[in-house]
Amino acid sequence: MSRYRGPRLKKIRRLGALLGLTRKTPKSGSNPKKKFHSGKKEQYRIRLQEKQKLRFHYGLTERQLLRYVYIAGKAKRSTGQVLLQLLEMRLDNILFRLGMASTIPGARQLVNHRHILVNGRIVNIPSFRCKPRDIITTKDNQRSKGLVQNSIASSDPGKLPKHLTIDTLEYKGLVNKILDRKWVGLKINELLVVEY
């Protein structure tokens, strides 16, 4: 299954707030289908919704998500927490968390168009797994700095997670450590995703 490129607000209305998907918010009371879906939710439906939240928030395909669940399952720690740590340490997500991109799809585009350097080397793979003490910068040209500057100016510095630091003057971010579960910005039950 390929990456979702359709209307994003429909997904937000169905699954709830997905901060990485878009900055737009749906109008209140604009979902006429909500009336018909009242009643008891089945276990399968709950698990499917949690999985879809994770997929659409991080912009993953079904195969990528299965691969991350497989890697997390091999770890000795809690599978759900390892899964979230793997997803949060992706380069596109770290750019979004630093405020260098307004959304995760925007961060993917920055990486794909070769505007981002990790430890002084160009990386054009959005799923690149960052490690502690990685330094993330932009290219020295004006175009790359301009793209990041707009996003940094509009981002809220109070929402920066504790495992990241950013230097807004030099457009440089640093990964300090691996993320704790409490700093994940998504309200999700990761155990239901693993069970699915």
Curated annotation (Swiss-Prot):
Main localization category: plastid
Domain S4 RNA-binding span(s) in chain numbering: 89-169
Subcellular location: Plastid, Chloroplast
Keywords: Chloroplast, Plastid, Ribonucleoprotein, Ribosomal protein, RNA-binding, rRNA-binding
Xref: SMART domains: Ribosomal_S4, S4
A Pfam family matched in the record: Ribosomal_S4
GO biological process: ribosomal small subunit biogenesis; translation
Region (Disordered): 22-42
GO cellular component terms, semicolon-separated: chloroplast; small ribosomal subunit
Gene Ontology molecular function: rRNA binding; structural constituent of ribosome
Domain of life: Eukaryota
Cited PANTHER family: 30S 40S RIBOSOMAL PROTEIN (PTHR11831), SMALL RIBOSOMAL SUBUNIT PROTEIN US4M (PTHR11831:SF4)
Cited function: One of the primary rRNA binding proteins, it binds directly to 16S rRNA where it nucleates assembly of the body of the 30S subunit.
Similarity annotation: Belongs to the universal ribosomal protein uS4 family.
Subunit structure as annotated in this protein's UniProt entry: Part of the 30S ribosomal subunit. Contacts protein S5. The interaction surface between S4 and S5 is involved in control of translational fidelity.
Protein name: Small ribosomal subunit protein uS4c
Gene that encodes it: rps4
